[in-house]
């Protein structure tokens, strides 16, 4: 099961247990707030909020590529063919 399904089952179970024991809503909210699952969700939310509000670090400049060594006896490129004139 995914986390959303487990979270829904958790809340429904707490709601049923609270309704059976008493009708006070404050105790139910207190129980939810102190539960381990909600503590984890709060800590993850705080962490995501810190990451979202933190300034982004400036990207480091990419290292310049090393110049390639030219081959010693490179043949001259063939003479470029003359360009043809276009008709107007």
Curated annotation (Swiss-Prot):
UniProt subcellular location: Secreted
GO cellular component: extracellular region
Keywords annotated in UniProt: Cleavage on pair of basic residues, Repeat, Secreted, Signal
PAPE repeats by residue range: 57-60, 61-64, 65-68
Keyword Secreted: yes
Stretch list, region Disordered: 49-88
Pro residues bias spans: 56-68
Domain of life: Eukaryota
Low complexity: compositionally biased ranges: 69-81
Propeptide residues, chain positions: 23-45
Predominant subcellular localization, coarse grouping: secreted
Keyword Phosphoprotein carried by entry: no
Tissue expression as described in the entry: Expressed by the venom gland.
Signal peptide positions on this chain: 1-22
Protein name: Pape peptide
Organism: Tityus serrulatus (Brazilian scorpion)
